[in-house]
């Protein structure tokens, strides 16, 4: 029945951790622009679905960036918040999913957004050649990542599926800059989101350029595996787990290898 409303998405409010991630990302973007590696409006942005990516993109409201554009698969609250704030001038997607709060506002005022949105077939929104040609910056959420930059975005503890890979694979593999964000710890600190060896891998280190937690940002572009590990441990790991990961990495390096591991412990 076309009169049925969409089921609203569950979106948690931004917090200190997501604001920290946003701040690190904004600083990274500012540096890229200053060094002429990105245009002043950053170029097309893609945002993965979920509370963390949504909160991080919303953080761009407090940045100096203007005339932002989005080329994504699913448009969520952050898209419309940036449009309402005058920060984003246009967004392209294949579908819209909104919280109950924002859904009512948007769907009751579609006239206000009709010249700022376009919805395309998924074959176009996620097309690898288009993603690459447009120079998209892909920002997606990780459940965990390991010290070499391999990202698990779907399986809790490697076995329990939390969500599908969605469009993150399409965008991460083909984006100009592939960024993954997550909080450095989960379950109140009982679990580190940065691990020696990812329990499930959706995105290999070859497809990952930048990793961000509230602790900091690791720019992995052009780095060898050991350099990637050092950048991730130094910048992304929560202090509760930094000593343990440093110890693991140092002992693994003593064994040698291009990508050192102690598989019995990893």
What spans do the regions from the language model cover?
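Metallocofactor- and cofactor-centric catalytic cores in central/energy metabolism, strongly enriched
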Residues: 1-121, 130, 134, 144-148, ...
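Residues that form or immediately flank small-molecule/cofactor binding pockets and catalytic motifs
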Residues: 124
């Amino acid at each position: 029945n076309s009169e049925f409303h969409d089921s609203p998405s569950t979106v948690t409010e931004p917090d200190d951790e997501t604001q920290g991630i946003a701040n690190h990302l904004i600083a990274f973007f500012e540096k890229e622009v200053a060094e002429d590696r990105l245009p002043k409006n950053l170029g097309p942005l893609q945002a993965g679905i979920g509370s963390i990516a949504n909160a991080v993109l919303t953080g761009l409201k407090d940045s100096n960036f203007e005339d932002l554009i989005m080329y994504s698969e699913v448009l969520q609250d952050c898209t419309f918040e940036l449009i309402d704030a005058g920060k984003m001038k246009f967004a392209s997607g294949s579908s819209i999913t909104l919280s109950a709060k924002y859904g009512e506002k948007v769907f009751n005022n579609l006239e206000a957004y009709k010249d700022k949105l376009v919805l395309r077939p998924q074959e176009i929104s996620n097309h690898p050649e288009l993603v690459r040609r447009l120079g998209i910056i892909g920002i997606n959420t990780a459940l965990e990542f390991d010290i070499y930059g391999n990202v698990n975005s779907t399986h809790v503890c490697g076995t329990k599926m939390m969500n599908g890979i969605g469009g993150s694979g399409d965008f991460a593999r083909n984006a100009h800059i592939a960024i993954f964000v997550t909080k450095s710890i989960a379950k109140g600190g009982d679990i580190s989101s940065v691990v020696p060896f990812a329990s499930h891998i959706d995105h290999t280190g070859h497809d990952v350029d930048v990793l961000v937690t509230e602790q900091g940002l690791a720019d992995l572009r052009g780095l060898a595996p050991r350099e990637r590990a050092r950048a991730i441990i130094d910048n992304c790991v929560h202090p509760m787990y930094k000593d343990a990961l440093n110890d693991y990495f140092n002992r693994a390096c003593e064994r040698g290898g291009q990508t050192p591991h102690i598989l019995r412990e990893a």
